[in-house]
Amino acid sequence: MNHWFDARSKWGRAAIAAAVFIVALATYCFTLAPTVTFVDSGELIAAARTLGVAHPPGTPLYIILAHLATLIPIGNVAQRVNFASALFAALAAAAVALLVGEMLRTPSTRQSSVRGEKKKRAKRAAAERNKEAAGDQSSDAAMTTIAAMLVSGLLLTFSRTLWSYATIAEVYTLNVMLTLSIFLLMFRWRRLSKETRERGDRAPHYRLLYAAAFLYGLAMGVHHVTIVLTLPALAFLVYSTEGFGFFKSKRLIYAALLAVAGLAIYVYLPVAASRSPLINWGDPKTFERFWWHVTGRQYQTFFSFSLDTMAGQLKEFARFAANQFGGPWLSLAGLGLTVAGFVEMFKRDKTVFFFFALVIIADLAIALNYDIAEDKDAYYLPVFISMTVATGFGAQWLIRTILKTKLRATLARAASALALLLVVAMTFAGNLRHNDRSRYFLARDYVENLFSTIEPGGMLLTLDWQVYSPMLYVSDIEQQRRDVVAIDVNQLRRSWYFDYLNRTYPEVMERNRDTVAPFLEDLKSWEKDPEAYTKNSTLSARIDSRFRDMILALVSNQIRTAPVYITNDIITIYSFIAEIQRRNKDAQASAYHQDGSWIMPLCDMYTLVPQGLVFQFSTDREFREPARPALLTRGLADGTMRFEEDDVVKQKVLPVYLGMMVNRGRYLMAHGRREQAIEAFNEALQIDPQFEPARQSLFQVPQAAPR
């Protein structure tokens, strides 16, 4: 066998990993998103480009590396950061191939359990084997290792979740790459330590352990939640290799110090904050604010250790897991290989089995109790990594099983290769349409469509992160429509955001200083001691009142000189509360939604005129011709892209397009513009023929027509 692809040699394993890396990187580059995407992409790109501070926990290592990517003079800034994700994911795929190869190099516990005469007889039997047969067996062993490395590497490459984050600006692929690199170093240290002891040497390979410790600290600077969850498994691996003695030795202190040295990457946060960058989330200059930011204080409310939450999340996890290798049906082969791999892992090396069992248990214990709307599948990546590692063991088991049949050796090898190739091909085919973002202009088009009907100098209020995050990129990085005053009302509940507004819209903030200053004073007090406001109804009422007054003033002061717009999500809340109050006149708006106290009076003060994808406030009730812009809808509903049912496009973006078309039609219908109303309803039905509000509204048009 050519030593370049011989899994028994160092260069052979490196060549296999390199092949996986090349395939992975090529796949990700061909399916790379050409611009900004939804969720956190826009904010992360803006923070990286300006060396700012991203949302908690700040992910300093990612921001620094992504910033370096933005300096590459190829493509737009978003493409460069998207490519960084692709590079990290490709390296992760290569790392998992090396990890599987490393674990298969460690002698099986079944082999190492042979003692005394059994061991001697085994040696004599081995010496008496026919050289040709020995050569065949050696070749088969090398082939199974090659197959295991390739299968695990390629299945991780094409797995749905990793691939989905490999084509956009997100932190998770870097996190996976570092996690697998730590695992690789630790298992190599374990093997070399065992070999050292067997030879009777006294020079254990602690450099690998220390390197893993330093890398662990660095990895904490990306997505520390999932990294921390690997600690029980890593501690178990150390114990199984060194025993309790390690935890009493200076080596533990050295490893801990190196991990802390890696953690020093977090010094970036206060240093960056002191520069007052454009994106300075949390403004972590002081130790107190730094601690709030790193610990993700604002997200801790998403944790709910209840059986109901776990039951719902478990169903969601099962769906994610079933789709990893191509979809509910296509995944059966990959999942079967995973199960077989875990069984083989248990038989071959129980330490490896329990290591990954601990990774899975720790991850599920937290992820099943963390209820967030987006990126939920990313929190299960440690489980999916473990599944992919198991497929490598499963591939080895499958080949050995086929080789033991009565098939001729050549035919058996061909059958094994074909079976494994089929598993990889099905995973690729099943996940390609879900993860091909080479024509993903949805977020960029969304922002363009929103801007298209906002007049120069207009103000836009939104509660929708899918609007605001990509808008940060388009406005602050690409410098488009800098005249638009875009405000995320959710972020008005964070004091750091006012620094951003003061820098970006100084005239607007100066004009509203009288209402902003009192609220900001209360807000900073609330941030220090939210419990005090919860317990004290007077304080709670005061901060709510000041928040409402500030928003009403922002709108009333702006509308004197320029138009003001709001996004559809605000009207959805308004309609929801209005319906409750229609049934119960004594109902308090704030009791049904935290934004009710300002949404209801604001929307009651003005007439709402649908303009494209937004509503414009009007101070009178006269009819205003609603804008009918030529909306960019590339990939939205033309069949060129496929979205999961829980995808943000289906859940939040598409409903805005459809809903605003219907709102325009209803507005026109209310003012006797029958033909125009019909056109608006039909536009919605062209995108989604089953959209019930459009169908119902279209049915009602003749009844609303003048008689």
Q: How would you label these PLM feature ranges?
A:
Residues 14-27, 150-154, 258-260, 358-359:
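Alpha-helical transmembrane segments
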Residues 29-30, 75-82, 116-120, 136-142, ...:
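Aromatic- and kink-enriched transmembrane "portal" helix at the membrane-lumen/periplasm boundary
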Residues 48-76, 86-87:
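Short hydrophobic/aromatic helix or loop-helix immediately within or flanking a transmembrane segment
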Residues 83-135, 181-185, 339-340, 389-393:
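Transmembrane-helix motifs of polytopic, lipid-linked glycan transferases
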Residues 101, 168-169, 173-176, 181, ...:
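ER/secretory pathway lumenal C-terminal domains and tails of membrane proteins involved
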